């Protein structure tokens, strides 16, 4: 009896037994957004309080905060675009090589797949049937080979532009939080408001991080808050010292 192979059956060599569903450890848009907000928040809290510590005119703090937001967001977006583009091009190149290997050396690729499934506990006869059935569908065979040999799915390659846009927006949102008080106030009141907003946002980011990592929400949120407050205290202290020295 011939075996009809579907993508689910073809993946049997990698997941022969049902098991507990795990978190997506390779990422996703929501995960990237959370960490982008965290970067923007920490960066601009540090910058704004560092500048505010020198007690300049409120306009100087606003300008510094806006510059940090724009520069940081563009930097994050550019870095994400370059990184994602390079990864996508590399994957596409490797997929093209695998496609050519399947075309030129089908028997060799067939034996590789049989050997792989056998090494994972699939009976030799069943492994042979699966590999043979796969060879009848070139695209499915390519998908399985690239997933097994490269660890990627050709159909799940992300968009560099989308990744860059997400990084830009996430960083900008995080960086805007400690800057908001400086559009409506100045002096110590704005400093305190920036610290409070930064602290609340840090707790929210820490809670979101815990959702992705599976850690304790309280512990992760407190850790995120502690990091933000240490960074804020250090930069504010440096700004104050520089302001006193130059004043």
Go through each PLM region and give its residues.
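Cytosol/matrix-facing amphipathic helices and coiled-coil assembly/linker segments
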Residues: 2-31, 84-168
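Internal alpha-helical transmembrane segments
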Residues: 2-83
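Alpha-helical transmembrane segments of multi-pass membrane proteins, especially transporters
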Residues: 31-36, 60-68, 72, 159-171, ...
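Residue-level signature of catalytic and energy-coupling elements of molecular machines
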Residues: 39, 78, 127-130, 171, ...
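Core segments of transmembrane alpha-helices
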Residues: 40-44, 167-177
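C-terminal ends of transmembrane helices
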Residues: 81-85, 152-153, 206-216
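Transmembrane alpha-helical segments of integral membrane proteins
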Residues: 177, 196, 200-215
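Juxtamembrane boundary at the C-terminal end of a transmembrane helix
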Residues: 237-247
């Amino acid at each position: 009896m011939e075996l009809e192979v579907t993508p689910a059956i073809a993946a049997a060599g990698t997941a022969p037994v049902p098991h507990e569903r795990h978190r997506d450890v390779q990422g996703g848009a929501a995960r990237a957004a959370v960490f982008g907000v965290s970067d923007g928040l920490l960066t601009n809290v540090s910058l704004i309080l560092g500048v505010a510590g020198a007690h300049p005119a409120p306009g100087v703090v606003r300008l510094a905060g806006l510059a940090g937001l724009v520069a940081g967001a563009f930097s994050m977006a550019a870095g994400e675009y370059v990184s994602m583009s390079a990864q996508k091009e590399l994957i596409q190149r490797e997929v093209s090589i695998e496609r050519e290997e399947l075309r030129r050396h089908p028997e060799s690729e067939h034996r590789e797949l049989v050997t792989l499934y056998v090494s994972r506990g699939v009976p030799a006869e069943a492994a042979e049937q699966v590999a043979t059935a796969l060879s009848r569908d070139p695209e499915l065979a390519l998908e399985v080979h690239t997933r097994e040999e490269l660890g990627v799915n050709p159909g799940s390659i992300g968009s560099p532009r989308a990744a860059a846009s997400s990084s830009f927006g996430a960083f900008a949102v995080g960086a805007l939080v400690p800057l908001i008080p400086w559009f409506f106030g100045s002096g110590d009141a704005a400093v305190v408001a920036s610290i409070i907003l930064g602290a609340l946002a840090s707790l929210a980011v820490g809670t979101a991080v815990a959702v992705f990592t599976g850690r304790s929400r309280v512990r992760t949120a407190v850790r995120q808050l502690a990091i933000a407050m240490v960074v804020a205290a250090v930069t504010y202290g440096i700004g104050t010292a520089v302001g006193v020295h130059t004043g």
